[in-house]
């Protein structure tokens, strides 16, 4: 497997599991970088009489630089594009018993309508804290159910207190604006929370210091042109 980019970008591989390897750059991608990922798997002996059937490739171009910072203590979210502040939002993050995860997260996907069910996080629907409802303008920032989303029911708390079950609450208009602004892979940095993002739960690429990331399994960092894996509401 190779990662190539123009301009050349220093990065490294990291094995998160025997069947899962990630490549990340040392620093955030530069806007406009052209990236090609190639997996030469045809004829590869994977063991136990399993063989690669074909080669695969994917090319993409890095978009505009978007970095958002969510401060769960000041209850404010600052959104930047190309290092310029474009939006400042009052937010409500996770309450004390359901904190929002902190760390350097990324936008995973966007979905207009998500049916959120409190049973998925161990809260019965019949509980005073239970819920089962459609939630709109959902921007996912983790693989474990954390979103930035519309929350008209908590507008009274946005900018002053944390009352959510872990997600970041915005007004409907602001949630829509952030949803439409966001690109897959955008950086979303959360600070002030007591719960750190789990490096093994899909949020690990930017949680792990680069030196440690590069030295786990796959070896030292390399230019992109030569990088290869080696060894709630």
Each language-model region and where it sits:
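Acidic, low-complexity Ser/Thr/Gly/Pro-rich repeat segments typical of extracellular/periplasmic
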Residues: 1-64
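Exported/periplasmic cell-wall-interacting domains
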Residues: 64, 102, 114, 118-233
């Amino acid at each position: 497997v190779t990662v190539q980019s123009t301009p050349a970008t220093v990065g490294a591989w990291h094995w998160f599991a025997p069947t899962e390897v990630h490549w990340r750059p040392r620093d955030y991608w530069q806007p406009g970088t052209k990236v090609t990922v190639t997996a030469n798997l045809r004829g590869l002996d994977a063991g136990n009489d399993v063989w690669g059937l074909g080669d695969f490739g994917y090319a993409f171009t890095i978009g505009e630089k978007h970095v958002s910072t969510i401060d769960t203590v000041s209850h404010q979210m600052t959104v930047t594009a190309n290092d310029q502040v474009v939006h400042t939002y009052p937010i409500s993050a996770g309450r004390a018993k359901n904190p929002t995860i902190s760390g350097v997260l990324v936008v995973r996907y966007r979905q207009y309508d998500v049916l959120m069910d409190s049973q998925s996080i161990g809260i019965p629907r019949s509980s005073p804290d239970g819920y089962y409802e459609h939630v709109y303008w959902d921007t996912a920032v983790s693989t474990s159910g954390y979103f930035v989303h519309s929350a008209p029911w908590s507008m009274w708390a946005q900018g002053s207190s944390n009352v959510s079950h872990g997600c970041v609450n915005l007004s409907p208009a602001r949630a829509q604006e952030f949803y439409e602004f966001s690109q897959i892979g955008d950086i979303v940095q959360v600070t002030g929370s007591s719960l750190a993002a789990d490096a093994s739960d899909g949020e690990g690429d930017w949680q792990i210091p680069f030196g440690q990331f590069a030295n786990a399994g796959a070896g030292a960092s390399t230019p992109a042109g030569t990088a290869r894996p080696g060894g709630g509401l």
